[in-house]
Amino acid sequence: MNSLAAEIPWLWAGLTAYLVATLVAMWGVAPRYAGMPMVKTKRHEQIVLFCLMLGVVLLAIAISARWVRIGHGPWISLFELLMSQLWSLGLIFVLLYWRLPGLRPSAVIVLPVMWILGSWVLTLEPEASHFPATYYNSWKWVHVGLGKMFLALLLAGVGLAGVLIMRNWEIGRRWFRSMPSDVIVDRLAWRFMMLALVFDSLMLIAGAVWAQDAWGRYWAWDALETSAFLTWLFLAIGLHVRLSYRVPTMVSGLIIIGIFVMAFATYFGTPYISPAAHKGMV
């Protein structure tokens, strides 16, 4: 990686803050010794919140520094996409972590997933990218914002799905003993998935309007658009199954994770192996 790029020190600093938040979150839920009392101080949660907020601010500075350096926002290359997603996922999770104390232990699931992106972005070169004329469109901003909300809500659902799955083992029951029952966690996870479906639907609509303005067609069934539709369909089917049948919590959690994996591949895989006209749901 080119260490001379202005955004790199800020990127490293932001990821370091996320790493500290991850380690503190894990330290906070893990029992210190056998027979430890069930009630523990939650002071560590304030440290996690502070580190996450700091990471979001530092990544915002990194994005701003790159914007000034290359003249456009982080919408084109995989390096830019990963950096902007690390910022938006962190921002939305900070808000959820702050407003919903009951889901805070799920940070030990969510933050390592974010660190997959963090490790990935550090392997890429921060070369300047070309900003195509089709991106000078106000609908692009709507499409981008809705997409970021969609992925962040999915990630919050994945955190709770991980709790449901890990509670099938003793270590998970000990780590997440302060969280509500599986029934409540499952309901909250699927509420996030319902919201994700709303934002996914709006994102596809905004993307279609943008495509009409940019390329003269609403939908072309290229690899990216097909993958995006299949993700939407998989999410809708998952919600239908969850609402129509008595699904065991283990299966429920696996469905949520499967939906996220498909969305992850659509965001970070398909755009870069497809000859589609645009780079993806940035």
Language-model region placement:
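Intrinsically disordered terminal tails
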Residues: 2-5
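Juxtamembrane inter-helical linkers in multi-pass membrane proteins
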Residues: 171-183
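Acidic/Ser/Thr-rich, low-complexity mid-to-C-terminal regulatory regions of eukaryotic proteins
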Residues: 134-145
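Hydrophobic cores of alpha-helical transmembrane segments in multi-pass integral membrane proteins
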Residues: 7-34, 42-130, 144-169, 184-214, ...
